[in-house]
């Protein structure tokens, strides 16, 4: 049995000075009826808490650590950069080098602007879309989280779903009125929205693989249909690849599905574990941003040299072969989970995309937020605590994606399957 006494003490202290004891809501472990685990250090595919408990890590800092914890080349790049200075507030050459690498790997990006978070990226892309098209309305999909910008916190998936909140107080009615929502994977719903509001819609923002209702890939024709609609009505298509960028494929999700948006938002992996976001796209559109154009966006720490070096070294190391290995490992996980769940009579639905996957305790095929919510949340809570006790660290929410890294091997997958079998046996009796 795991001992969590130091984590419990740390959480008690944190609650005195931080809202809810955390700096991001899902970290509080509320949806699994547990106290959060405070981590101390990580190495490769493993993470260790302050009590000395070691776990196979499938959270990976919510996706950024595609090379695993403390990758030597990334750590070395950060260290060398820090010795020169942590921030200058001026251009640096490494910004250009990372930008070139992003442009090389992401089909839609001709020019890219670096920011400090995924939320900044999506907020800035929305402003750019509105300024470029001279329109105000945005179409998004139910259950998709695009950061905590006000206009995007409408039916926003994992963040609010984990807390059981439909929206966030503080989001004005005016902003909500300019945000149109339809179910994910519902191209007919999108067509109806365009029939009604088409001349007013500045952009459609979509996760090419939804990652904040679990992991939900696009059905055939969905992304292609959005590309056709936005082109027809003169709206921009924005892919939020903050999560899927460099996770789904060497060329990101847009490369894998062969659909090219007008703008792309990035984050997570391109920071190598440090705070980074980016948005980019067609030169004609991106040159509307100041100082090249009149649409304003700025940031004190945008292009921070530590983050740029970490991101460059992370993306540089990734090869097409890594994605072949990711798919092989996740197929092994899927086959094992499917066999065990059938044998233990546990309803289970599994989705996957590149180096990320999601599973739901339901008999239904999960294709949108409504079907994701059919998962047995009480079973998930009990399952989560049992898996944690067996050294498997998963996202503490049914509506978050699960990630692997280049440091995960068949050994970690098999240990996880063994823990899953034991957990199902305990919970099913």
UniProtKB/Swiss-Prot annotation:
Principal location listed in the UniProt entry: cytoplasm
Keywords assigned by UniProt, alphabetized: Cytoplasm, Isomerase, Porphyrin biosynthesis, Pyridoxal phosphate
Broad EC category: isomerase
Protein known as: Glutamate-1-semialdehyde 2,1-aminomutase 1
PROSITE patterns: AA_TRANSFER_CLASS_3
InterPro entries (UniProt xref): 4pyrrol_synth_GluAld_NH2Trfase, Aminotrans_3, Aminotrans_3_PPA_site, PyrdxlP-dep_Trfase, PyrdxlP-dep_Trfase_major, PyrdxlP-dep_Trfase_small
Subcellular location: Cytoplasm
Family per record: Belongs to the class-III pyridoxal-phosphate-dependent aminotransferase family. HemL subfamily.
GO cellular component term, pick one: cytoplasm
Modified residues (N6-(pyridoxal phosphate)lysine): 268
Required cofactor(s): pyridoxal 5'-phosphate
UniProt-recorded Gene Ontology molecular function terms: glutamate-1-semialdehyde 2,1-aminomutase activity; pyridoxal phosphate binding; transaminase activity
Matching Pfam families: Aminotran_3
Subunit details: Homodimer.
Reactions mediated catalytically: (S)-4-amino-5-oxopentanoate = 5-aminolevulinate
Organism, scientific name: Listeria monocytogenes serovar 1/2a (strain ATCC BAA-679 / EGD-e)
